[in-house]
């Protein structure tokens, strides 16, 4: 697709991979909307990247049902969903609570589904569209303390395949990107560790570059899934 002038929504676009992707898309000429729950953070990020801010909670159905028509109206159309909003909690199985499971799945599974559903309704009507789900290498291989997060990303991979099977007949590309560890505030908050500078680890911009490459394929071609690993993490 031609990214210049594409109309794009990035969920969870105020920080981390979402912000880096929104910035890269805007620099490539796309018209970008970002959404998040924190008004101040979303408005600040949108101002810095030249995008349009929307305050929305992807796990709240009414919020999402309102969001997509607002994006379509504001951008003058809608071509691409970067389904990026995510949440993580990490704990040993014996310490994992029902609230941990609900909180992670409400954003990573329910939220992703609600935004994809409302976006798909618009894309089907226009017989074109793109959905990129931002998953994780944790969705391909479980790890200690990852019961809530890894299971949600395994679920997202299944959802990606279901949606692709349903939507490709409408000329809608459903794709998934699986980042390995990325130096973002999300990663540090989720694991309760201090932010460090490590040039061997991935940055949000590395994932943004991969997403741009996936979208830039001719519309007749679809990169169904891409996994991005650090070459030699220390």
Question: Where on the chain are the PLM-derived regions?
Answer:
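C-terminal helical subdomain
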Residues: 169, 176-177, 194-234
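Conserved glycine-rich Rossmann-like NAD(P)H-binding loop of the short-chain dehydrogenase/reductase
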Residues: 30-43
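Residue(s) in the substrate-gating loop at a strand-loop-helix junction
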Residues: 136
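The beta1-alpha1 cofactor-binding region of Rossmann-like NAD(H)/NADP(H)-dependent oxidoreductases
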Residues: 56-67, 98
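Active-site helix of classical SDR
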Residues: 116, 152
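Substrate-binding pocket helix/loop in short-chain dehydrogenase/reductase
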Residues: 92-93, 100-102
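Conserved glycine-rich cofactor-binding loop
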Residues: 14-15
């Amino acid at each position: 697709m031609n990214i210049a002038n594409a109309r794009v929504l990035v969920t969870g676009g105020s920080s981390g991979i979402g912000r880096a992707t929104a910035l890269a898309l805007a620099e490539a000429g796309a018209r970008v909307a970002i959404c998040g729950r924190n008004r101040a953070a979303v408005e600040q990020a949108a101002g810095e990247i030249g995008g349009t801010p929307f305050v929305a909670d992807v796990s709240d159905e009414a919020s999402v049902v309102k969001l997509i028509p607002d994006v379509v109206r504001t951008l003058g159309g809608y071509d691409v969903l970067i389904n990026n909003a995510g949440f993580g909690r990490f704990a040993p199985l014996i310490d994992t609570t029902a609230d941990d499971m609900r909180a992670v799945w409400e954003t990573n599974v329910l939220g992703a589904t609600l935004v994809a559903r409302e976006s798909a309704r618009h894309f089907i009507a226009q017989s074109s569209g793109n959905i990129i789900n931002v998953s994780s290498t944790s969705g391909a291989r479980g790890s200690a303390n990852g019961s809530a997060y890894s299971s949600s990303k395994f679920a997202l991979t299944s959802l990606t395949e279901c949606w692709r099977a349903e939507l490709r007949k409408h000329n809608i590309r459903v794709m998934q990107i699986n980042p390995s560890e990325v130096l973002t505030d999300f990663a540090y908050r989720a694991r309760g560790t201090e932010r460090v500078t490590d040039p061997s680890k991935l940055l949000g911009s590395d994932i943004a570059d991969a997403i741009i490459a996936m979208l830039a394929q001719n519309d007749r071609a679809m990169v169904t899934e891409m996994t991005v690993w650090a070459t030699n993490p220390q």
